[in-house]
């Protein structure tokens, strides 16, 4: 099932109020009339980000009565000082598991951005009894043959040449620097200068092992957990390809398209919050 922005704003009986989304260079403002169903969300950031990237969306969901957690994984954001060469995918999976277990969260709508798709899949595999729905926000969907952020040669197990070249530029040999490899347009277009300024202030290097570690599943990962994909089709520079989307266009998935950039939670927080809120009404 593919859902587009218009369907979300119409609400389909979910009690949502349509909002005008500005695209003039500033992030949108305003509030939505959400439905009364109370859900628990755990919003997981992607590469180079921290929990801060979800704050505007979280504020809107909380205003609607939902419980929302925006944890920051080890070695990222305000926890950047805890980084080290040993920090990898399993570290980040454990970070998020600890939130679910220590906060005693159940019926969680677990959302992951970008390459945290592997992280949330690992969490879902180990704590599937706590997950109501898993949501990939323009994220990598792990599956057989692609269980890490970097696809290895299937015959030799080697990393691709482009990755080996990038490794030479890593900070201290293990941290990926966004600005070394990509322009701001990787995250948002130049029509959002305020958001870009925020990103320049808050972006931190990212532990490369979170990309390169292979995810090992024992209990099906995202399968059977109402998997949902939100595709940011407004991304112009290096749009997420089908290599990221993988099986998410299949019949067992809910597939949503939003005309927003990769960091759409910053440029269009109300639309993203409205979209996530609508998922709380779907069983």
Where would I find each of the regions flagged by the language model?
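Conserved HGGG/HGGXW glycine-rich cap/lid loop of the alpha/beta-hydrolase fold
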Residues: 39-78
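Catalytic active-site module of serine/aspartate enzymes centered on a nucleophile-bearing elbow/loop
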Residues: 256-283
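C-terminal segment of N-terminal export signals and the immediately downstream linker at the start
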Residues: 22-42
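Conserved loop-alpha-helix segment in the C-terminal half of the alpha/beta-hydrolase fold
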Residues: 233-259, 263-266
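N-terminal export signals
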Residues: 7-29
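Active-site loop/oxyanion-hole signature of alpha/beta-hydrolase fold enzymes
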Residues: 73-108, 125-126, 151-153, 158
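Conserved hydrolase catalytic core segment
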Residues: 109-144
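Flexible "cap/lid" loop of the alpha/beta hydrolase fold
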Residues: 136-170
